[in-house]
């Protein structure tokens, strides 16, 4: 917890914060007490307790005024410490953290649920409460999203933010709301490869320009207050056209530093004379623009907005930017969060990891999280297992494993009729959270984008072009790709395949489980299920 010790927020003397005992004004001082300046410290003199208190009072008043950083430790029990300034600006608890408030939370299907929480409840506490009520699997990816539909702005709340404090800053009678959904990209900046989130061309330093810096050192530079990294790149800024009243987009070279966000009025110049100040990182929040083309006339779909905290409603005062692609927008958003929250963001990540490990130790079924680098193809046909290095041989082994799964499933589901269980097998996918029914291609991309463009986020939907087919929508390299799943019939049994029948599965559940362990024809494993949870 960080405390703001500036004199503007606290009293200027120790007596104002923590009153020291003194002699009452109606009680005269003892006559045998000489002034402190006449006391000869080398002579042993009896010192009464009242005189000792007066000497301490004199010494305390003669010292320089130092604010007391912990007024609540010396205040009377009945008197609460008075702290100046906004509690949210300094990261302190609200004055009455036990006060109960009602917060409305929406799910992705539009359902609303009112939750009674304490004024000091953080976003992580509210998410844990909602996970328990929805009987969902608890993990670090759950989060609350602050949504402003009228402005087409959304941002994910950090785990340490106070939900009630954010809600009280909304305009009265507006359409602002909290949405409960998964956000797999929340802590991806601590997990991703070095240059996935921070390309070399966008990262520079005011001290030296080092190339080939490791991911750990790069993140440490953002968290270290003594370093001066910055993000730079071209952005299109929304402004007014002269005399026309229309909003025009103009391309500028922008810089994001600890001191704020700037753009250069003269090419790529970093001269202070050419830098135009835009916003303060600590006094603003960054949002993703959801309907940029429709509402703001953006030239691309990769827009974000810097909204000052003092701005409550209306479009006036919003700083809206448009980047060239998703990677550059993700870089700007991640850097803004690191500059704003610093070490607190990493503490949130560590706490989320510790909670996940604790739940796993207590027996909760953890999510299987594996990467491509930790899985290898093995051959156990001989007396001892060996690692398969040949890619073609590894693909053949994966196909044999899929065929073994198919035979095992057929034997398990076999009844007096050979394929009498095919109807049950063909409908089992409808009970899975990753199946979204008949939604469009654009809707699937929107759902995956809302829950984080992280490698391995996927869902399965019905194909709109092929009445009997399905589509696997998968995110890879911050792009959503779609793979057609077609049914085929062999010996009276129904199978599903994505590679023209070379690898066949008896149902979609078997197909998904196989590709959670084996890439097959996919660019990455199926890691995160894009699911909707009803509150």
Curated annotation (Swiss-Prot):
Sites of Phosphotyrosine modification: 187, 341
Annotated stretches, region: Disordered: 1-90
Superkingdom of source: Eukaryota
Ranges for domain SH2: 434-530
GO cellular component annotations of the record: cell projection; cytoplasmic stress granule; cytosol; focal adhesion; plasma membrane
SMART domains: PH (SM00233), RA (SM00314), SH2 (SM00252)
Reported effect, residue 483 to F: Strongly reduced tyrosine phosphorylation. Abolishes interaction with FHL2
Membrane topology classification: Peripheral membrane protein
Alphabetical list of Pfam families matching this protein: BPS, PH, RA_2, SH2
Primary location group: cytoplasm
Entry-annotated residues carrying Phosphoserine: 364
Subcellular location: Cytoplasm; Cell projection; Cell junction, Focal adhesion; Cell membrane
Free-text description of this protein's post-translational modifications in UniProt: Phosphorylated on serine and threonine residues in response to activation of receptor kinases. Phosphorylated on tyrosine residues by TEK/TIE2. Phosphorylated on tyrosine residues by PTK2/FAK1, and possibly also other kinases. Phosphorylation is enhanced by activation of receptor kinases. Tyrosine phosphorylation is essential for activation of down-stream protein kinases. Phosphorylated on tyrosine residues in response to NTN1 signaling. Phosphorylation promotes stress granule disassembly during recovery after cellular stress.
Keyword Repressor: yes
Keyword line: Cell junction, Cell membrane, Cell projection, Cytoplasm, Lipid-binding, Membrane, Phosphoprotein, Repressor, RNA-binding, SH2 domain
Record field: compositional bias (Pro residues): 21-37
Chain's role: Adapter protein that interacts with the cytoplasmic domain of numerous receptor kinases and modulates down-stream signaling. Promotes activation of down-stream protein kinases, including STAT3, AKT1, MAPK1 and/or MAPK3. Promotes activation of HRAS. Plays a role in signal transduction in response to EGF. Plays a role in the regulation of cell proliferation and cell migration. Plays a role in the assembly and stability of RNA stress granules. Binds to the 5'UTR of target mRNA molecules and represses translation of target mRNA species, when not phosphorylated.
Quaternary structure and partners: Homodimer. Interacts (via SH2 domain) with EGFR, ERBB2, ERBB3 (when phosphorylated), ERBB4 (when phosphorylated), EPHB1, INSR, FGFR1, PDGFRA (tyrosine phosphorylated) and PDGFRB (tyrosine phosphorylated). Interacts with SHC1. Interacts with RND1. Interacts (when tyrosine phosphorylated) with FHL2 and HAX1. Interacts (via SH2 domain) with RET and PTK2/FAK1. Interacts (when not phosphorylated) with ELAVL1. In stressed cells, but not in normal cells, part of a complex that contains at least GRB7, PTK2/FAK1, STAU1, ELAVL1 and TIA1. Interacts (via SH2 domain) with KIT (phosphorylated).
Family named by the database record: Belongs to the GRB7/10/14 family.
Record comment regarding domains: The PH domain mediates interaction with membranes containing phosphoinositides.
The protein's name in its UniProt record: Growth factor receptor-bound protein 7
């Amino acid at each position: 917890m960080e405390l703001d010790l500036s004199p503007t927020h606290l009293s200027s003397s120790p007596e104002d914060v923590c009153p020291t005992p003194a002699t009452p004004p109606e009680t005269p001082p003892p006559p045998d007490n000489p002034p402190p300046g006449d006391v000869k410290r080398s002579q042993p003199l009896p010192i009464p307790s009242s005189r000792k208190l007066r000497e301490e009072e004199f010494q305390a008043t003669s010292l320089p005024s130092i604010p007391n950083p912990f007024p609540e430790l010396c205040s009377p029990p009945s008197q609460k410490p008075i702290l100046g300034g906004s509690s949210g600006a300094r990261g302190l608890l609200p004055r009455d953290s036990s006060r109960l408030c009602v917060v409305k939370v929406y799910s992705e299907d539009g359902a609303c649920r009112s939750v009674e929480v304490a004024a000091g409840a953080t976003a992580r506490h509210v998410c844990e409460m909602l996970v328990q009520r929805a009987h969902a699997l608890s993990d670090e990816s759950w989060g609350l999203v602050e949504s402003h539909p009228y402005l087409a702005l959304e941002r994910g709340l950090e785990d340490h933010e106070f939900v009630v404090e954010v809600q009280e800053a909304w305009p009265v009678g507006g359409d602002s709301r909290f949405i409960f959904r998964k956000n797999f990209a929340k802590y991806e900046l601590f997990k991703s490869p070095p240059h996935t989130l921070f390309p070399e061309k966008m990262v520079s330093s005011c001290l030296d320009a080092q190339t080939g810096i490791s991911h750990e050192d790069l993140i440490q530079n953002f968290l270290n207050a003594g370093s001066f990294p910055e993000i730079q790149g071209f952005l299109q800024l929304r402004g007014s056209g002269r005399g026309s009243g229309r909003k025009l987009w103009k391309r500028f070279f922008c810089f994001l530093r600890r001191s704020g966000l700037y753009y250069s009025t003269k090419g790529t110049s970093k001269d202070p004379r050419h830098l135009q100040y835009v916003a303060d990182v600590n006094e603003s929040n960054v949002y993703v623009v959801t309907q940029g083309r429709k509402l703001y006339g953006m030239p691309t779909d990769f827009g974000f907005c810097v909204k000052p905290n003092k701005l409550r409603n209306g479009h006036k005062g919003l700083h809206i930017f448009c980047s060239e692609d998703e990677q550059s927008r993700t870089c700007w958003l991640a850097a803004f969060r690191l500059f704003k929250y610093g070490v607190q963001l990493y503490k949130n990540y560590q706490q989320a990891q510790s909670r996940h490990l604790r739940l796993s130790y207590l027996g909760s079924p953890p999510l299987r999280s594996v990467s491509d680098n930790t899985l290898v193809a093995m051959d156990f046909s001989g007396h001892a297992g060996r690692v398969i290095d040949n890619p073609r041989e590894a693909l053949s082994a994966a196909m044999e494993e899929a065929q073994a799964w198919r035979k095992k499933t057929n034997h398990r589901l076999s009844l007096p009729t050979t394929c009498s269980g095919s109807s049950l097998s063909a409908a089992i996918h409808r009970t899975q959270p990753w199946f979204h029914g008949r939604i469009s291609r654009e809707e699937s991309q929107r759902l995956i984008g809302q829950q984080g463009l992280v490698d391995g986020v996927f869902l399965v939907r019905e194909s709109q072009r092929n009445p009997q087919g399905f589509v696997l929508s998968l995110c890879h390299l911050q792009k959503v790709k779609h793979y057609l799943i077609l049914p085929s019939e062999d010996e009276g049994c129904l199978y599903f395949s994505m590679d023209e029948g070379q690898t066949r599965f008896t149902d979609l559940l078997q197909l998904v489980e196989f590709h959670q362990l084996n890439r097959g024809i996919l660019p990455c494993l199926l890691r995160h299920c894009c699911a909707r949870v009803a509150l």
